[in-house]
Amino acid sequence: MVFPIRILVLFALLAFPACVHGAIRKYTFNVVTKQVTRICSTKQIVTVNGKFPGPTIYANEDDTILVNVVNNVKYNVSIHWHGIRQLRTGWADGPAYITQCPIKPGHSYVYNFTVTGQRGTLWWHAHVLWLRATVHGAIVILPKLGLPYPFPKPHREEVIILGEWWKSDTETVVNEALKSGLAPNVSDAHVINGHPGFVPNCPSQGNFKLAVESGKTYMLRLINAALNEELFFKIAGHRFTVVEVDAVYVKPFNTDTILIAPGQTTTALVSAARPSGQYLIAAAPFQDSAVVAVDNRTATATVHYSGTLSATPTKTTSPPPQNATSVANTFVNSLRSLNSKTYPANVPITVDHDLLFTVGLGINRCHSCKAGNFSRVVAAINNITFKMPKTALLQAHYFNLTGIYTTDFPAKPRRVFDFTGKPPSNLATMKATKLYKLPYNSTVQVVLQDTGNVAPENHPIHLHGFNFFVVGLGTGNYNSKKDSNKFNLVDPVERNTVGVPSGGWAAIRFRADNPGVWFMHCHLEVHTTWGLKMAFLVENGKGPNQSIRPPPSDLPKC
């Protein structure tokens, strides 16, 4: 019983904080295959410790976490600790060929990092190939000793992980797509804590049940681990109070629908204030680009009030329509940093590096792509499709290796056009391994501009090594003179993954106070595969704690 054990561990941490403050937390992740049946189909999947989803990591703020990852499968493996700042410990960040070479079959690597200045819901996942479809789990960071939540303490906490499921092997799915030059097949189901819920013409194979008691409040730690789709999340007859996103507290607000993009986390309180019974939990996709294919199936689970007979009919709900842009915007526009004395919003007011990055698709020639009419769909930032190196970029930077990358990533698009209007006739991109160099402690603004090339689309952009403030969002083309005057520099939401709206833009700001090489990419796995990614190289500072630490002795070799 995975979740009761997690709850006991959580209670133990809360009950004995003096024993765990600044403690060392040790975990072993055995990466193994397991035969699993979902939607009346059985296949082998890659897992951690034979669990899907994988085990939850529990820690307090200031704890040091050591995870020994042992690779027992045929694939190369790496694990990313999504949202952990990794201050000066980039060797533990995890993206393959960016901060480390992957762990080869039969080998192991100990990820060693300290949780500094963070508390809340984060998650971990594989960061190579498409393995994160099944190799993922939660990270729960509890506040440090003597520091309560800035909201009423819930009766219980529950991790809820949303994902996708393919009947076919996911590596086969992506490899076939790359050979054809076309988009991969969409998933066959969405899942809630590993289960799709009701599936027509398929007998029930178990589903997730959230057990509650009338009159009590529960904290849901919600994670979108789906590969390619933003999701709406609802519970029939209940409303949420959102209190945190991406492990940063927000001004609480009430909603009946949560929007969560791949890579994002949302923590919300829900009160069991309805009449006893069973209530449907639903997760379904949001996609307001009419030409982009999605898996339109709804994953379901159940809220079960104590004392309710299992045969009691479940009260139902319907998620918003797939193209419910107004619902999505209402949720996103409600997010504000707490900006209190204890949790200030330290937004950079002045900017040293003002960057405009276009994010979108392109089409390159491909002589072997017969199914794609000898063309391949690609993705790019500022028209550069990122070329993955064969040596880890952080290693190349630290040891001054040459010929691996260049530091001339453009600050602005080299080709200016009506980004959200009619696409240019030439949709080809440049393929290169280019980084953008930042001096230590410099302030950065990045405007992420979607393009209509091939198709406008939402892009959940994730930045490793930093949190950032979302100071502005808009539709159409970004206008630096008009739109910057409307920026929120007082209490903008702080997070690590931002949803760039379809046919629009998002403006983020952060301080480059973490030396190393830090990946930035779309968290739609198909777009990352196609090349929508780049990296920042943050130089060492001059102070004693402003340089990246030496690499560990067991760092994997390429």
Swiss-Prot record:
The keyword Signal applies. It catalyses: 4 hydroquinone + O2 = 4 benzosemiquinone + 2 H2O. Its EC number is 1.10.3.2. InterPro entries: Cu-oxidase-like_N, Cu-oxidase_2nd, Cu-oxidase_C, Cu-oxidase_fam, Cu_oxidase_CS, Cu_oxidase_Cu_BS, Cupredoxin, CuRO_1_LCC. Residues 1-22 form the signal peptide. One of its GO terms (cellular component) is plant-type cell wall. PANTHER family: LACCASE-10, MULTI-COPPER OXIDASE. Lignin degradation and detoxification of lignin-derived products. This is Laccase-10. It comes from Arabidopsis thaliana (Mouse-ear cress).
